[in-house]
Amino acid sequence: MTPTTVVSAAALDAEPGLDAFGNDPWWIILIKALAVFVFLMLCVLMMIMADRKVMGRMQQRHGPNRFGPWGLLQSLADGVKLSLKEDLIPRTVDKVIYIAAPMIAAIPAFFAFSVIPVGPEVTMFGVETRLQLTDLPVAVLLVLATASLGVYGIVLAGWASRSPYPLLGGLRASAQVISYEIAMGLSFIAVFIYAGTLSTSGIVEAQQNIWFAVILFPSFVIYLITMIGETNRLPFDLPEGEGELVGGFMTEYSSMKFTMFFLAEYVNMVTVSAMSVTLFLGGYLAPPPITTFWPGANEGWWPALWWLIKFVCVMFLFVWVRGSLPRVRYDQLMKLGWKILIPIQLVWITAVAVIRVLNNQEYPGYVTAIVVGVFGLLVFLGLWAWSRAAAKAKAQEAAEHEAELRARRENPMYGGFPVPPMIAPHYGTSVLAEEPRYQPASAPKREEVSGA
């Protein structure tokens, strides 16, 4: 027995539902792998196109409408254009890391989608197989790990460019991913508590009766926020803020290397959207109103259609948020991640765990109600204390600001200026009246010497 067989047997013992994987013919696995790759590339092309068209409508303009019918081939044309551009490599870069960074950012993004279930078991070319490339007992952790690996490419791109703007963009990206991945992982924990498994197909099957987005709504909302921060999209696109860092970590890149960073960003968007459908929106299961009058809605290829509809709705959220919200400041980004999302998620997970234990132990309903009431009271007291502290800090900040304005009125040079203002005394046009202005002495007249 090989080590691989031993590991597979142990995985099947731990997760009985995984016995449907690993028994497909090699050509079925190859077809599914190619289908995943083609689907991701098509999603990237269509997402870029939808991004530009929807943004155009939200800004009361047409968007790209020249290349192809209704401009649908514009993304393909942009890709061809970028591939034909000159591939410039600055002289001072660390060449090996500079070239490897785009690949490090793009390749892990494709791996994560391999554990996303798109549908149940179907018949494909006469073979019974699931619409999922593979599954693992820790599939969700695999997605979380591969999503965080991409930031290494961003950080290395900033460092290898040997330029201040890319370096700052890389540092921002690493801090942002660390901050928001903690909150994202905490939102997964609530799902694990209710599903009892970390396998993606098992989590979908656990939502047969009710979606986790309903019973775990705070975790769902926090996940939606963190997935936007994880993919560096507006309003959290600080690593590539044009007004501050030109192009951020991509400033020194061109041609296909530049394209690979964009490819990684959009593939990550596809992955986190698919994960939100899997963890919170019932995956490929039909919405409950449909299953009440159509028992066969979750059979055959129909579940793939329900999954696709949910997936498109979540992807539209990225475009809608980008067109509606302005970019936040970096301190606001860090404050949201560390001071708001993580504390709320910790309190929520504690409440979910306690309620889950009480339900499993079959305690009376009034005990659960008392626990929920105590948690609600604690949350209310915490919010009240936080609001008082915030109001006090705001009043103190306003008082300090008023004192600074008063000091500036009394002394124009208060705080110092890189360039002195025009009212400073050493400008000739604004010298005080009582100070005598310097008058240069007149030059003596030359005496003409007459010849003898």
From Swiss-Prot:
EC number: 7.1.1.-
UniProt-listed GO biological process terms: aerobic respiration
Annotated keywords: Cell membrane, Membrane, NAD, Quinone, Translocase, Transmembrane, Transmembrane helix, Ubiquinone
Top EC category: translocase
Keyword match Ribonucleoprotein: no
Subunit description: NDH-1 is composed of 14 different subunits. Subunits NuoA, H, J, K, L, M, N constitute the membrane sector of the complex.
Purpose: NDH-1 shuttles electrons from NADH, via FMN and iron-sulfur (Fe-S) centers, to quinones in the respiratory chain. The immediate electron acceptor for the enzyme in this species is believed to be ubiquinone. Couples the redox reaction to proton translocation (for every two electrons transferred, four hydrogen ions are translocated across the cytoplasmic membrane), and thus conserves the redox energy in a proton gradient. This subunit may bind ubiquinone.
HAMAP family according to UniProt: NDH1_NuoH
Family the UniProt entry places it in: Belongs to the complex I subunit 1 family.
Protein name: NADH-quinone oxidoreductase subunit H
